[in-house]
Amino acid sequence: MAGNSILLAALSVLSACQQSYFAMQVGKARSKYKVTPPSVSGSPDFERIFRAQQNCVEFYPIFIITLWMAGWYFNQVFATCLGLVYIYSRHQYFWGYAEAAKKRVTGFRLSLGVLALLTVLGAVGILNSFLDEYLDIDIAKKLRHF
């Protein structure tokens, strides 16, 4: 069973490393801009880095859930490829935001697009599994007849 989801698991570890990296950047920014915990305001440069990291944390559960649902119920390889694009887009978002608030937009939009696609693929896969399991309707088989 574990071998069936190795790509999803590996990408999950990679994404957790990215989250840790972003958190470390906030720690470095705290030192650089002299913002001591629990304060979350101070230099605008610090605040942008902090907000970028917090936004990544806020979207992380959505990413993990949609990644695994699309991978389990639709296609693991395709979901993993989309997950790699998501990780890239979050990297672009984080460093764009750290530089200037307006530079975050491209990475943010790309990440939202990936999340939307993962959500749709997961929903389609779950619907197909439900129909096959409980109503004995195999959509993939029916589509091959066209």
From Swiss-Prot:
It is found in: Endoplasmic reticulum membrane; Microsome membrane. It is a multi-pass membrane protein. Keywords: Endoplasmic reticulum, Leukotriene biosynthesis, Lipid metabolism, Lyase, Membrane, Microsome, Oxidoreductase, Transferase, Transmembrane, Transmembrane helix. It catalyses: RX + glutathione = an S-substituted glutathione + a halide anion + H(+); 1-chloro-2,4-dinitrobenzene + glutathione = 2,4-dinitrophenyl-S-glutathione + chloride + H(+); leukotriene C4 = leukotriene A4 + glutathione; (5S)-hydroperoxy-(6E,8Z,11Z,14Z)-eicosatetraenoate + 2 glutathione = (5S)-hydroxy-(6E,8Z,11Z,14Z)-eicosatetraenoate + glutathione disulfide + H2O. The chain crosses the membrane at residues 6-26, 59-79, 111-131. GO terms for molecular function: enzyme activator activity; glutathione binding; glutathione peroxidase activity; glutathione transferase activity; identical protein binding; leukotriene-C4 synthase activity. GO terms for cellular component: endoplasmic reticulum; endoplasmic reticulum membrane; intracellular membrane-bounded organelle; nuclear envelope. Each monomer binds on GSH molecule but only one subunit is catalytically active. The keyword Chaperone does not apply. GO terms for biological process: leukotriene biosynthetic process; lipid metabolic process. Its EC number is 2.5.1.18, 1.11.1.-, 4.4.1.20. Its main location: endoplasmic reticulum. Catalyzes several different glutathione-dependent reactions. Catalyzes the glutathione-dependent reduction of lipid hydroperoxides, such as 5-HPETE. Has glutathione transferase activity, toward xenobiotic electrophiles, such as 1-chloro-2, 4-dinitrobenzene (CDNB). Also catalyzes the conjugation of leukotriene A4 with reduced glutathione to form leukotriene C4 (LTC4). Involved in oxidative DNA damage induced by ER stress and anticancer agents by activating LTC4 biosynthetic machinery in nonimmune cells. Belongs to the MAPEG family. Homotrimer. This is Microsomal glutathione S-transferase 2. It comes from Bos taurus (Bovine).
